[in-house]
Structures are given as structure tokens and as C-alpha cells.
Regions:
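N-terminal Rossmann NAD(P)H-binding glycine-rich loop of SDR-like oxidoreductase domains
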Residues: 10, 14-19
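Conserved glycine-rich Rossmann-like NAD(P)H-binding loop of the short-chain dehydrogenase/reductase
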Residues: 25-37
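Active-site loop of short-chain dehydrogenase/reductase
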Residues: 60, 105-117
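Conserved NAD(P)H cofactor-binding loop of Rossmann-fold oxidoreductase domains
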Residues: 67-72
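Substrate-binding pocket helix/loop in short-chain dehydrogenase/reductase
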Residues: 74-75, 82-84
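A short, exposed helix-loop element centered on a Lys and neighboring polar residues
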Residues: 98-99
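Catalytic loop of short-chain dehydrogenase/reductase
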Residues: 112-128
Length: 128
């Protein structure tokens, strides 16, 4: 049984990964909102990774960062604060999380880190 930490596992892709991994792994979910299920292999920490210290987790094999944030507006409608907020969530949050858990992760079984992005970064969207 692996120990998997998911940042953003309460909704979307993060939640789908959480549900897929629960039967055969211990899953630690860190998100502002709790997942809609309970399971003996699930431990949830309700917090914003940018605002609070991350919880101590003793054993980690996989770290998955998928906070799910994007501003789909025309660039002229985005404020500097919009850009700053997205950067904080998608870059600073990922770096903070990796730095916090890297020492523990290095001790894991075949450790891995998975960072999710948005399709808009690759695909391009009109007026975005």
C-alpha cells in the first residue's frame, strides 16, 4: 500500500484520482473543501496551502499537486491581482508543497511528484 498525498482532491481531476487510488492506497487529501466521501484509507486536511502550514505526514510515496485554478477571461479583463493569484496557486503553492514534503518523499518507495496544469496552457483559447 502506497501513501499518496493529493493537493486539491475534493473536486475535478484531483477527486477522480483520489477515488481511483482509495481501494489500494492510503490517500491524504489536502484541500479547502472536504471530498464528498469517507473511506478508511482517506485522511482529509481542510486548509489552503498558501495560507497555512502543511500537515506533517510521516510516509509519502507520491505527491500529486492539482489545485484546479484558471481565469478564463480575455487578457484585457484580467487584473494584475488575477495573474498574481493564479501564479500564487499554481507556482508558489506547488513549490511550497514540494519543498515541505521532499525530505519525506525521498524516503518513499519509488517516489514521484505529479504536477497538473491546464489545457489552456497548451491548447490556447480564443480571447484568452
Amino acid at each position: 500500500m502506497k501513501n499518496i498525498v493529493i493537493i486539491g482532491g475534493s473536486k475535478g481531476i484531483g477527486n477522480a484520482i483520489l477515488l481511483q487510488q482509495l481501494e489500494s492506497n492510503m490517500v491524504y487529501n489536502i484541500s479547502r473543501n472536504a471530498p464528498t466521501i469517507t473511506h478508511p484509507n482517506l485522511k482529509h486536511f481542510s486548509l489552503d496551502v498558501l495560507q497555512y502550514a502543511l500537515p506533517e505526514i510521516e510516509n509519502i510515496d507520491t505527491l500529486i499537486y492539482c489545485p484546479g485554478s484558471i481565469n478564463l477571461k480575455p487578457i484585457g479583463s484580467l487584473s494584475i491581482d488575477d495573474f498574481r493569484n493564479d501564479f500564487e496557486i499554481n507556482v508558489i503553492g506547488a513549490v511550497k508543497t514540494i519543498q515541505n514534503y521532499l525530505p519525506v518523499l525521498k524516503k518513499g518507495t519509488n517516489p514521484s511528484i505529479v504536477l497538473f496544469s491546464t489545457v489552456a496552457a497548451k491548447l490556447g483559447m480564443p480571447f484568452h
